[in-house]
Amino acid sequence: MENRLIILGSGAAPGVPSLGTGFGRCNPENPKNVRTRASTYLEYKGVRLLIDTGPDMRAQLIAQNIRNVDGVLYSHAHADHLHGIDDLREINRINRQSLDVYAGKYTMKKIEHRFDYLQEGYQQRYPPSEPGNERGQGQQAFFC
């Protein structure tokens, strides 16, 4: 197995082009100026590591035909580096085991707080929404 490093995305937090400023000073004619949020895939001695899980992660992995990773390293707790974390559940289904997650203490605390439902032993706190169920003020029901 070969070692490899793939830059999955290198765009700023809003992506390029952004909704607000478009391409900014970047040339829209250059395809390299269409960039997804920052993420990197590292494969070394058979270990597959994802660095950050931005909101574009699923599309990035599909584009590179990456279907599995062994772990994730988080650089920091900004949304553009971790809000694709929910898509790791599909990788859990493939592996049938938990993923190793690495981060500094502050970042790990933020992840555990924002995404508590991803932790082992999580108990669902709300009954599933079904057509016809009433919700009180302040509660939300989504039907997909």
Predicted regions and their residues:
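Binuclear metal-dependent hydrolase catalytic cores
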Residues: 1-144
